[in-house]
């Protein structure tokens, strides 16, 4: 499957350096695809002993990437969900550092849960948000 995705994907610029914040299920797959495309990528996990971890980001434990961890980053993808209180840990802890950088692209990987129960119907970004679950409402 990864090889098929690589064959169908557009490579990023040669000088691209991607930071994936949250290397769990989805973030881990994205990280592997970016690496397979030959692009430099750094992936955060809650622990360096986690598979695919290049740096640690665990805001609940006070483990925040340093400014030097962000050096050279051109693209950022966050998959980290908001806290139970609705705060985005990435914006809270890294927002000011990221704003100072010349980023080419910043993205947030959310959930289809923000569209609510669509009874199996396809949804897109053009559909109105209608989250039913508290977790989806925070996203």
Spell out what each predicted region is:
Residues 71-108:
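NAD(P)-cofactor binding segment of oxidoreductase domains
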Residues 30, 53, 86-90, 94, ...:
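Short glycine-/acidic-enriched loop or helix-start segments at secondary-structure transitions
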Residues 1-60, 66-67, 78-79:
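Hydrophobic, well-ordered beta-alpha structural blocks that scaffold small-molecule cofactor pockets
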Residues 44, 106-112:
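SDR active-site strand-loop-helix element
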Residues 119-139:
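Catalytic helix-loop patch of NAD(P)-dependent Rossmann-fold dehydrogenases
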Residues 49, 112-115:
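Active-site loop signature of alpha/beta-hydrolase-fold enzymes
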Residues 24, 110-111, 133:
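Catalytic nucleophile serine of serine hydrolases
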